[in-house]
Design a protein with these regions (language model features):
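Helix-to-loop junction immediately C-terminal to a conserved catalytic motif
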Residues: 50
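Conserved ABC transporter NBD signature motif
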Residues: 58-72
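Conserved ABC ATPase "signature" region
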Residues: 107-124
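Conserved ABC ATPase signature
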Residues: 126-130, 134
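Catalytic Walker B motif of ABC-type/P-loop ATPase nucleotide-binding domains
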Residues: 151-155
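H-loop (His-switch) and adjacent beta-strand-loop-beta switch element
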Residues: 200-213
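ABC ATPase nucleotide-binding domains
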Residues: 214, 218-245
Length: 245
């Protein structure tokens, strides 16, 4: 079953194509990495998929339904690249925000999740009072707490320390492997994609490559964009991770 299907998607800004003729599908249970240079349209693509932006042409389906009629948003967890909505006036504590949208509260899981994101000591603080990195950890905790069927992360670890970053990626991989959660990770870090994702979409305003990471490693796209030395390091890391997993 396709969790996401995108057909011939084009989005323009000021008359210029930001993304053009994008077609791909994400099957249930896949860990997909979307990678590309700055300005390649990665975040724009995600915003079109979620209906935040309206495409100039093309079609998006979520869980088999056209985006225009899709209403099952509890199935989706999304962390945007910029947390501009969170400010000093946001009326909620960390623990309230992290549990937002949950049908059943679970104090034990809440505490464990907050501690894993190293914000357990901030549970009673207003989220708008936190630093950007602390806010980001709180929103990651919210996405993980909800256990949705689809998780979408747009550059989720930019303000995290290396240890918390590793914990986060390991948690998303565990949810993917054990729970069958479909994960989409948008990043500029091809090494992270190689370590955690099964499939890869390389975007530069249009789809340059779509397929498994293994196939990407042997493609001319990989060699052309990253060079043979980086290709060897990244692909060897991917093979080692898969054999150990």
């Amino acid at each position: 079953m396709s969790i996401i299907r995108v057909d011939d998607l084009t989005f323009r800004y000021n008359g210029l194509n930001v993304i053009s003729d994008i077609t791909f599908a994400v099957e249930k249970g896949i860990y997909l990495g979307i990678v590309g240079p700055n300005g390649s349209g990665k975040s724009t693509l995600i915003k079109n998929i979620l209906g935040i932006l309206q495409p100039d042409q093309g079609r998006v389906e979520l869980f088999g339904n056209p985006l225009s009629v899709f209403r099952q948003w509890r199935k989706i967890g999304y962390l945007p690249q910029r947390l501009s909505a969170l400010n000093a006036h946001f009326p909620g504590t960390v623990e309230e925000i992290v549990q937002m949208g949950l049908l059943k509260k679970d104090a034990v899981t809440l505490r464990r999740t907050l501690d894993m994101m190293a914000i357990g000591h901030l549970a009673s603080r207003l989220i708008g009072e936190l630093s950007y990195g602390e806010q980001q950890r709180a929103m990651l905790a919210q996405a993980l707490m909800r256990r949705p069927e689809l998780l979408i992360f747009d550059e989720p670890t930019t303000a995290l320390d290396p240890e918390t970053r590793e914990i986060f990626y390991s948690l998303t991989q565990e949810m993917n492997r054990k729970d069958g959660t479909t994960v989409i990770l948008v990043t500029h870090d091809i090494g992270v994609i190689g370590q955690y994702a099964q499939n890869l979409l390389y975007l530069d305003k249009k789809v340059i490559f779509s397929g498994t990471f293994k196939d990407f490693c042997s493609s001319q796209v990989m060699t052309g964009f990253f060079g043979p030395t980086s290709q060897h390091i990244i692909c060897h890391q991917h093979d080692s991770t898969r054999s150990n997993g």
